[in-house]
Every structure is written in structure tokens, then in C-alpha cells.
């Protein structure tokens, strides 16, 4: 039996669909395809139709893609230092058709910030490479994101994709978890960048695995890695500081900024942040894995305990 969604949720997702079109410079058909619906369904949504128009699973998939919140979640997005740095990076890349490479710690909110920023940008697209590791899957994922049909051959889809990006102009494409791309996918990414010079900004994000993959490829003179590193300014950009003292200050501010905006009881602030620290040899140090995810869990537990009192 198919699940039923509330009219309230469908309305929220439909409103997000209509609003996002204003930021998509392509045709209605291309925009609709990027969401997995037809242009006629988009038109009917604009006219107010909801019932039996889209299957529940598709509603949910679109809602997730567009960042529509489900239920009564009170989690508040925060413009952290990570958010502000990435905002500057994204703007620079899009306005100047340049490419940058961000390699940083896990759990500082890179993906979360990227999704929020891209949702606000014109002609900006996001691909999670961990879900599209191979050459075929990567090209198809990017094609679907920008609104290109994937029914043609892979070579034709790639040509259509390159043509469409150039035709739109001023595009921005963020490749998250880029270290998961296999070798052939990396080569196609390089070809796409070469074929859209001056027409599209690119941004690759990942953690240590991405750095290791590129460095290893360059060291062993594997075709393409030196070229793609050069396209991305020949530099591994990082937001998290290198020195111990600066890192601790960075993480403390990151935790505090997020916790302050999301904790209702500010008296719990210091206690919650303190739990994000681990002790090694009797000294406090900050974990570098799942930091903000752990903080989010602590905050939600604290909120639940308060509501039960």
C-alpha cells in the first residue's frame, strides 16, 4: 500500500519547486527533468494542482533535494565560519568561472553548507560523488541535476551536457565527496572542465581521501591528475587551521555558534560543548570526526530531556 503524504507537506514542496525555478536559467522542460518530473506536471503545480499528481516517493525525493523540512523540526541553520568561507568560494568560482578544491576535516558542515548555498544560487548544481562513483553514474547524475535527458548514449549525454553548460553560462557545479570518483570519472570531469572554460565555475570537496588520491596520481604520473589539480588552482584549500591552538579555537567557535542558535536553554551551552571534547592523557582535545553530527545529537537529547521535565 502506497504511503500518503499530508497536503501541507505537498504544498511546501510544490512552493519550493516553483520558487527554485527562478534560480534555474534553463527551460521549464530542463528544470522539470532535473527534478524527475515533466514540464506539464510543473505547469499543473503552478496552477495549484496537488492530488494524484506526483507519487509520494517522488514528492519526498524532490523535497529532500530542495531542502524542504518535514514535520516540526526546530533545527536552525547557522552561518558558521565554514558557511561564510564557502559562500565566498562559491561566489568567486561562479563569477569568475574558476575552480577551487576544498579538502578539510569530516564533520565541519561542508555538505550541509553546500546544499544550503546552492539552493540560493542561480544556475548552481550539486552532485554527491559517493552516490555516483563510476564514469557512467557520474555523467548521468550531473546530467539529471542540470536537466539533461540520460536516454541517449553516454557519449551523446556528455556532449549534450557540455553544450548545455556552455549555453547557460555562469553556471556553478559542486562535486561533493569527490575522492570517491573512480579514475575514468576523474578523466571525464577533467574533460568537462576543459570543455567549459570561461563558462562554468567548479568546486570539488572532500576529506583526506581526496587529497591522497590526487597526490598519489600525481606522484605516479597517472594521466589526468596533474592537469585536474592545475585546473583547481594547484592547491588544496582548507578552512580548518593547521596549528593546534588555532584548530582548538576554530572548533570551539564552530560548536558555540551552532549550539547557541539551537539550544533553547542557554544555561546548558557550556555543558553541551564540553561533551564534544575528548580527553587524551588527561588533556582536552577536539575530535576531528563527526564533530557537528555529534553536537547535533547532544543538542536534540538535551532538548528532549527539557521537554520531558
Spell out what each predicted region is:
Residues 1-30, 34-68, 235, 240-309:
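C-terminal alpha-helical "lid" subdomain
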Residues 67-81:
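Short C-terminal boundary/hinge segments that cap the last helix of small helical domains
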Residues 77-95:
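Pre-Walker A adenine-sensing motif
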Residues 95-116, 130-131:
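Walker A/P-loop nucleotide-binding motif
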Residues 101-106, 195-224:
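Sensor-1/coupling segment of RecA-like P-loop NTPase cores
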Residues 121-131:
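Conserved catalytic segments around the Walker B and adjacent sensor/switch elements
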Residues 122-124, 217-240:
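A short helix-turn-beta junction within AAA+ P-loop NTPase domains corresponding to the substrate/partner-engaging
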Residues 134-135, 140, 149-190, 194-201, ...:
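Mid-core helix/loop region of P-loop NTP-binding domains shared across ATPases and GTPases
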Amino acid at each position: 500500500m502506497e504511503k500518503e503524504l499530508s497536503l501541507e507537506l505537498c504544498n511546501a514542496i510544490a512552493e519550493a519547486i516553483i520558487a527554485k525555478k527562478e534560480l534555474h536559467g534553463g527551460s521549464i522542460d530542463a528544470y522539470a527533468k532535473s527534478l524527475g518530473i515533466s514540464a506539464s506536471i510543473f505547469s499543473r503545480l503552478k496552477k495549484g494542482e496537488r492530488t494524484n499528481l506526483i507519487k509520494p516517493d517522488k514528492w519526498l525525493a524532490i523535497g529532500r533535494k530542495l531542502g524542504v523540512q518535514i514535520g516540526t523540526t526546530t533545527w536552525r541553520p547557522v552561518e558558521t565560519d565554514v558557511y561564510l568561507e564557502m559562500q565566498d568560494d562559491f561566489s568567486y568560482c561562479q563569477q569568475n568561472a574558476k575552480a577551487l578544491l576544498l579538502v578539510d576535516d569530516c564533520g565541519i558542515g561542508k555538505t550541509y553548507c553546500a546544499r544550503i548555498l546552492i539552493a540560493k544560487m542561480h544556475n548552481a548544481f550539486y552532485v554527491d560523488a559517493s552516490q555516483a562513483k563510476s564514469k557512467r553514474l557520474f555523467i548521468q547524475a550531473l546530467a539529471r541535476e542540470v536537466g539533461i535527458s540520460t536516454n541517449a548514449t553516454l557519449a551523446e549525454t556528455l556532449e549534450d551536457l557540455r553544450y548545455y553548460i556552455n549555453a547557460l553560462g555562469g553556471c556553478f557545479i559542486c562535486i561533493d565527496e569527490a575522492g570517491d570518483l573512480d579514475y575514468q570519472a576523474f578523466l571525464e570531469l577533467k574533460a568537462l572542465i576543459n570543455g567549459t572554460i570561461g563558462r562554468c565555475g567548479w568546486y570539488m570537496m572532500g576529506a583526506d581521501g581526496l587529497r591522497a588520491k590526487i597526490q598519489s596520481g600525481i606522484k605516479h604520473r597517472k594521466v589526468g591528475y596533474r592537469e585536474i589539480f592545475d585546473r583547481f588552482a594547484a592547491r588544496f584549500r582548507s578552512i580548518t587551521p593547521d596549528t593546534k591552538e588555532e584548530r582548538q579555537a576554530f572548533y570551539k567557535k564552530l560548536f558555540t555558534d551552532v549550539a547557541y542558535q539551537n539550544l533553547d536553554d542557554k544555561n546548558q551551552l557550556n555543558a553541551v560543548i564540553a561533551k564534544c571534547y575528548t580527553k587524551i592523557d588527561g588533556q582536552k582535545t577536539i575530535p576531528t570526526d563527526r564533530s557537528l553530527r555529534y553536537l547535533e545529537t547532544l543538542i536534540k537529547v538535551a532538548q528532549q530531556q527539557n521537554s520531558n521535565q
